[in-house]
Amino acid sequence: MQSSGFAGLRIGVTGAGGSFGQALLRQLHQQGASLVALRHGGAALELRDGAGALIPVETVAWQVGEEQQLTELLAKLQILVINHGINVMGARDREATRLSLEVNTLSALRLLELFLASPNPGGQRREIWVNTSEAEVNPAFSPLYEISKRTLGQLVSLRSLDAPWPVRRLVLGPFRSALNPYGFMDAERVAAAVVAQVLAGRELVIVSPNPLTWLLMPLAALGRRLYFSWFTRRPDP
C-alpha cells in the first residue's frame, strides 16, 4: 500500500543497482514517488516489491566522468540521491587512489553542482541527498574509502551554505552490500529509516548502531558549518 510522502515527485538515485539503492527505491515507491534509476551499464533495473510485483522504474545509463550528459535529466528531477561509490578495501596504489577520489568524491561533487545549478522556474520542491557514510567520522578499515568520503563530506558542508534548496546528508552504518560484505545491518531497514527521518524534516540523517556516530557527526557538521561560514565569502550573485 502506497503512502503519499513523495507523491508526484520524480526522484533519481545513483548507485541504484546496489543493495541500498534498490531498497531506497522500494521505500520511495511506497511513498508514491516516480523513480529514476541511474546506473552504470545498459541493463534496465528490474525492481520488485515485497510481494514480487514489478515496480515501475525508469533506468538511465551513465558513466563516471560523463556527468554533464545528465544535465537535461537532472533539471527534470525534484530530488537527486547521490549514492554511488567504490571501496578498494586495503589497496593503496596509484590506480586505487585515483578511482576512490574520482568515483566517491569528484563524481559526486560534479552531480551536486549540476543539480544545484539546474533551473527551477516553477519554484517546485527540490532537494538533494548525499550518502557520505559514517566513514566521515569513524574508521571504515579502508583508508582510501575514508579519505574520499571525508573529503566529500567536507565539500557537502561547504556547498550547502549557498545551496538554493535542502542538501541532506545520509550518514549510514555498515549494511550488507557489495561494497561492504561484512556489514550486519539490513539495507531494507536502513532505507526505511532514511525515508522516515527525511519525512520528519531532518537534513542530517543518521542510521547507525554506533553511539559515537550519533555523537561525533552532529558536532562535526556544526563545526564545519561555523568554520566555513567564518572563513569563506558568499559567491557573487
Regions found by a protein language model. Give the residues of each.
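Rossmann-fold scaffold of SDR-type NAD(P)-dependent oxidoreductases
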Residues: T14, L77-I86, N104, V130
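N-terminal Rossmann NAD(P)H-binding glycine-rich loop of SDR-like oxidoreductase domains
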Residues: T14-Q27
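Conserved glycine-rich Rossmann-like NAD(P)H-binding loop of the short-chain dehydrogenase/reductase
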Residues: Q30-L47
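Rossmann-fold cofactor-recognition segment
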Residues: D49-Q68
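Short alpha-helix in the Rossmann-fold core of NAD(P)-dependent oxidoreductases
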Residues: G85, S100-L112, S148-K149
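Catalytic loop of short-chain dehydrogenase/reductase
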Residues: M89-G90, N120-L161, P174-L179
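Short alpha-helical oligomerization interface
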Residues: G90-N104
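C-terminal helical subdomain
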Residues: W165, S177-F228
